[in-house]
């Protein structure tokens, strides 16, 4: 889960692989889970039940969790629990927010088929470039006019390619974009609207469209009961006044969502920004990303504490 970023931090644990670095904290996640494993093994005789510990790959591309699920590694699991470091939260604080926390992530490609002609006779062709530009503009109306202002919806086009030469009506065009939503219902409605609008716009100018979709991850919706259980542990680890229960949802995705769909669960966000230290406050996916390592102790205590507490209360 390293990212294709050249690390610029000058630290002993700087990436040894040119052009890639851990710029989102997945190395910290693995370290904290290993620490929790050590505690759990040392106290295995005091634990009533079975604990499945997943060191999951491929979160950054959105398919790792489904590989674990498809292989039955979370079958018959009563609770799921995970944690992610956050440079937006001060060290010593934990977000255990029920409900939507992260958006679904869908990638799409729209191909527009037109017909080439000389630019002096546009009526003899079908301008795929013009059609594509109208699709880009019109699908923004999904957010502005077809979605409730109370719903968090994002439709973004990041790539558009069309045309062969300045004096030829473009015979084809392609665009790539993403859809981000916080609920399955809004997600379904938005995807349907994109296809409907693009198809109708293309038909209006004599063109045709085709679609490709990739479903990277579902919306991450924390189970309320699981959050309350985790909060009881966090009360001991960091104190009740350091528990955040109203973190604003993010439109970035996380495939921890897939586990929570299978069994009730909670995904917490551990503060990794040391107060007064700008280096640990750098945004994720940045070449200077780093953490306050004190946050690892919090993560270790939460992982081990929640597992032991839940199993012993439900033995």
Give short role names for the model-derived ranges:
Residues 38, 42, 70, 305-308:
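Short, well-ordered alpha-helices that flank and scaffold nucleotide-derived cofactor binding pockets
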Residues 41, 57, 112-114, 181, ...:
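Hydrophobic residues in beta-strands and at strand termini
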């Amino acid at each position: 889960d390293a990212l294709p970023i050249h690390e610029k931090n000058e630290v002993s644990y700087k990436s040894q692989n040119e052009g890639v670095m851990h710029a989102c904290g997945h190395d910290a996640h693995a370290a904290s889970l290993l620490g929790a494993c050590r505690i759990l093994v040392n106290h295995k005789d005091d634990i009533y039940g079975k604990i499945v510990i997943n060191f999951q790959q491929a979160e950054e591309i959105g398919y790792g969790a489904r590989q674990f699920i498809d292989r039955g590694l979370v079958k018959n699991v009563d609770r799921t629990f995970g944690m992610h470091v956050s440079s937006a939260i001060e060290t010593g604080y934990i977000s255990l927010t029920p409900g939507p926390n992260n958006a679904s992530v869908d990638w799409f490609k729209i191909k527009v088929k037109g017909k080439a002609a000389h630019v002096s006779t546009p009526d003899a062709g079908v301008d795929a470039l013009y059609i594509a530009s109208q699709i880009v503009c019109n699908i923004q109306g999904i957010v502005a006019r077809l979605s409730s202002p109370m719903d968090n919806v994002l439709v973004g086009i990041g790539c558009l390619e069309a045309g062969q030469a300045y004096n030829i009506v473009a015979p084809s065009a392609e665009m790539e974009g993403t859809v981000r939503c916080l609920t399955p219902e809004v997600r379904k409605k938005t995807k349907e609207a994109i296809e409907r609008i693009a198809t109708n716009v293309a038909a209006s100018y004599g063109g045709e469209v085709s679609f490709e979709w990739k479903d990277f991850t579902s919306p991450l919706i924390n189970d309320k009961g699981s959050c309350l259980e985790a909060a009881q542990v966090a009360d001991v680890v960091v104190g009740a006044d350091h528990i955040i229960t109203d973190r604003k949802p993010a439109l970035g995705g996380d495939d921890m969502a897939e586990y929570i769909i299978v069994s009730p669960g909670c995904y917490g966000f551990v503060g990794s920004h040391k107060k007064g230290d700008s280096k640990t406050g750098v945004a994720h996916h940045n070449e200077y990303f780093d953490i306050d390592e004190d946050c690892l102790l919090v993560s270790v205590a939460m992982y081990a504490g929640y597992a032991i507490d839940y199993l012993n209360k439900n033995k």
